[in-house]
Regions:
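Disordered, acidic Ser/Thr/Pro-rich linker "stalks" and the adjacent N-terminal cap
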Residues: 248, 252-346, 357-360, 427-500, ...
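Conserved, well-structured core segments
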Residues: 48, 58-65, 87-91, 120-126, ...
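Eukaryotic intrinsically disordered and solvent-exposed regulatory patches
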Residues: 33-37, 44-46, 86, 107-108, ...
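BTB/POZ-protein C-terminal extensions
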Residues: 159-162, 168-318
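Post-BTB helical module
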Residues: 104-188, 195
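N-terminal BTB/POZ boundary and linker segment
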Residues: 1-65, 94, 98-115
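Cytochrome P450 catalytic domain signature, combining two hallmark sequence patches
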Residues: 69-84, 106
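Trp- and acidic/polar-enriched beta-sheet ligand-binding modules for extracellular glycan
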Residues: 335-337, 356-435, 487-492, 511-649
Length: 649
């Protein structure tokens, strides 16, 4: 057999082409990395010498360049170092050797290194643009973070611009504020890190303890304090300490003897403390991200209102007309105590989730105020003139609070002895969340459809075999008998109430379109069921199938659709309603649209509807359409009807 024949027949298997050599196990078993790793710190095949802290280290250009853009530019990018046999680098020696071992082997045992070496490694990974290594070291530092090293890790993160690691360190310090103030590592903080820490509202500890720790920091860093410009920095740091949060006794006995605090600073603090409302002072508070702090487990309790035990028990299923809620009598008195929840301590929150009693179609109006001392209150939610129901998702700017006051101003149904209107709240949660939706004038400006059962929207007027047919999102399964909501022309309407007021600028609807009929209608919105604003007038248009309506952004909690014409019979049929409109063009700012689509252009948009819309194209003349659908034989159990008869055709 010839040598050529032997070569051509290597690895001739059904899974490989003739001449292919598959030695994958050579790479998987680590043989290649072992061979490359053996070249680390070896002069064998070396073509460059790196000088670090005076020590010469043999290296290989191609391996360095393949591992990092920094070395690729340095050794092959036309810089003078590309033609030098020796290249000097500014780096700590031990950390650089560990970096080389990583470059040549892909392995690094961080747990075997000293903490200062690990931080040096982080700096080298940043300097030489080893992004994966930088991320891996950052993850490792998160895992081993402790009081002894958090300050040095924070300084390193600030130095290298590692925002995620820096935030993690600050959050760790927030959670351990009292302990870190007494730890020796606090004295090692850089000026910038110290100022950043003191500026945080979430660095929660008694202000007098913070002041004492800052004094200790000054004493431990006297060389810096006495340096040029040091005194100016001292004043900046002292301004980060919130003297107004201390008692007068603490100001006079603890702060006053400290030399850097001038008499003017002390007097200004006393004046601000005595003349400023507590709600206007900058407080510190406990921050527990994404955790409900209004629970008995966290020390919260209801201190005002009737049937207090229900509000914070977490049970949002078992409630009826007799139990499962906390209540208070609604009155016009400006000092109405309402329902008050006291948190265990001052806490930072920006989100309240509230469940209003919703076993019928009643609506409530209310407002929410917060306080740190139960004396000065600030209103964070004002729905006192808006109809609201069921679950309320309420967002506001982060605030430090200890008291939450819920005051009802209206209940559309309930009265006690026909005299007193009562406000009922089933559940309340309070937390700080990073998942804040877009807001406009304090109201949610939704991106996704909020007219859904899941978000507590409800059809309060209109006839349907299924109570939630209009809001269930089903735009495919409807026919002559089911899948729509309707009302008699000239009598009644279709009315949808959202759970709470939203800032809306568009609505999309699907008119019943199983034949070639067309409709006319108009749409109004309201906040209280008495005052209505028209947002669409299509009473003179022949409309069918999908309808997209744009209007100037406004608060909306109730939507009313009134049909004025049906080309086939005397009933207006609606299959689906959503707001805002879930089409790309509807998400564009209406103010930026040079020309809105006309009603005729919106008659039918197959791309926005179901796959069967193509068969529902422009209708032929009415005379060519099919006959009216048969009338249903019987009316289903009472739903949300407003008429005595059913209108399904």
């Amino acid at each position: 057999m010839s040598s050529q024949h032997q070569y051509m027949s290597v690895n001739n298997t059904s899974s490989s082409r003739v001449g292919d050599i598959e030695h994958i196990n050579f790479f998987r078993s680590g043989h290649l990395s072992e061979h490359i790793g053996s070249l680390c710190l070896s002069s064998e095949y070396s073509d460059v010498t790196l000088i670090v802290e005076g020590q010469r280290i043999p290296a290989h250009k191609v391996i360095l360049a393949a591992s990092s853009d920094y070395f690729r530019a340095l050794l092959y990018g036309g810089m003078r170092e590309a033609n030098q046999a020796e290249v000097e680098l500014q780096a700590p020696l031990q950390a650089f050797k560990a970096l080389l071992r990583y470059v040549y082997s892909g392995h690094m045992g961080l747990s075997m290194l000293r903490e200062d070496t690990v931080l040096d490694m982080l700096g080298l990974a940043h300097q030489f643009n080893f992004q994966e290594l930088e991320a891996a070291i950052s993850d490792y530092l998160r895992q081993v973070l402790a009081l002894r090293n958090v300050c040095s890790v924070l300084d390193a993160a600030r130095l290298y611009g590692l925002d995620a690691l820096m935030d993690y360190c600050y959050n760790f310090l927030d959670r351990n504020a009292t302990d870190i103030l007494q730890h020796d590592s606090f004295l090692q903080l850089s000026v910038e890190a110290l100022q950043g820490l003191l500026e945080r509202d979430s660095f929660f500890a008694p202000e007098v303890d913070i002041f004492k720790a800052v004094c200790n920091w000054f004493n431990a860093n006297q060389l810096w304090v006495k340096s040029e410009g040091g005194q100016a920095q001292v004043e900046k740091i002292l301004k980060c300490v919130r003297l107004t949060l201390m008692s007068l006794e603490e100001l006079l006995t603890v702060v006053r003897p400290f030399a850097p605090v001038t008499p003017d600073m002390l007097l200004d603090a006393i004046q601000e403390k005595t003349q400023t409302k507590s709600t206007e002072l900058r407080h510190r508070g406990l921050l527990l991200p994404e955790e409900n702090v209004a629970t008995p487990k966290r020390g919260a309790r209801v201190i005002s209102g009737d049937m207090r035990s229900a509000l914070l028990d977490g049970d949002t299923d078992n409630y009826d007309m007799e139990r499962g809620y906390t209540r208070h009598t609604i009155s016009d008195a400006p000092d109405n105590p309402g329902i008050v929840v006291r948190l265990a301590t001052t806490t930072i929150i920006n989100y309240i989730r509230l469940l209003l009693w919703d076993r019928d179609n009643r609506s409530y109006a209310y407002y929410i105020e917060v306080s740190v001392d139960q004396k000065d209150w600030v209103r964070v939610i004002d729905h006192s003139n808006y109809f609201c129901r069921s679950w309320q998702n309420l967002y506001f700017e982060p605030r430090v609070v200890q008291y939450i006051k819920l005051v009802g101003t209206s209940n559309t149904v309930n009265k006690v002895n026909n005299l007193y209107v009562v406000f009922h709240a089933v559940s309340l949660e309070a937390l700080h969340t990073a998942r804040v939706p877009p807001l406009c004038n304090g109201l949610i400006k939704p991106v996704h459809n909020v007219a859904t059962v899941e978000l507590s929207a409800v059809v309060i007027e209109g006839i349907s075999r299924s109570r939630n047919a209009l809001l269930n999102g089903d735009t495919e399964h409807y026919d002559w008998d089911q899948g729509y909501t309707c009302h008699q022309l000239g009598s009644g309407a279709i009315v949808v109430q959202l759970a709470q007021p939203y800032m809306l600028s568009s609505i999309r609807m699907l008119l019943w379109d199983c034949d070639y009929r067309h409709y006319s209608y108009y749409v109004e919105t309201s906040l209280n069921y008495w005052d209505w604003e028209m947002v669409a007038d299509r009473t003179r248009d022949a409309c069918r199938s999908w309808q997209v309506i744009y209007f100037t952004p406004r608060p909306v909690s109730i939507i009313r659709i009134i049909g004025t014409n049906n080309s086939v019979n005397e009933v207006f049929h609606l299959v689906h309603l959503e707001c805002p409109a879930q089409v790309e063009e509807a998400r564009e700012d209406p103010a930026a649209k040079k020309q809105r689509p006309s009603p005729q252009e919106n008659r039918l948009n197959p791309s926005n509807g179901s796959s069967s819309d193509a068969s529902r194209a422009s209708p032929p003349p009415a005379a060519e359409g099919p006959a009216d659908p048969p009338r249903a034989r019987s009316l289903p159990p009472a739903e949300t009807a407003t008429e005595a008869d059913e209108y399904n055709d």
